[in-house]
Amino acid sequence: MDISGRHEEAGEYLMVAAAVHATVGTARLQSVVGMGFATSRNEPTLERTTAVVAEATDELPNPPDGPIVAERGEFYEEPEWEVEQFLGHDFKYVESIAERETVQAAHHAAYAARKLLL
């Protein structure tokens, strides 16, 4: 998953979270199964950020059978267990090349969706 727009622009916020459900091998993303999106105009905090991510994950056509994966910076480098408590779903930070590629796909999706909404 990835979030675009956690910064203030012209006195407003527009966070767009993209969740990508993908099948991955050991070294690469194999296929995208589905995507989910959610938005928030609230000032970002850990609680609000995890809420928009949970909403995007709920929008996936099929629930993921593995953990939600993100870059460390998405959740202010908080420990995985703390992020997991807010999400209510298994969570971990990126560890493999395939996970990084999946997060990169989510980044492109979140960025593009945000640009469409502006």
PLM regions: where:
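A two-mode feature
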Residues: 23-26, 49-118
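Acidic/glycine-enriched edge-of-secondary-structure segments
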Residues: 27-51
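Short hydrophobic beta-strand that contains or immediately precedes a catalytic carboxylate
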Residues: 1
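Acidic, metal-ligating active-site segments
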Residues: 6-33
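Short strand-loop junctions, especially beta-strand C-caps/beta-turns
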Residues: 4, 40, 71-73
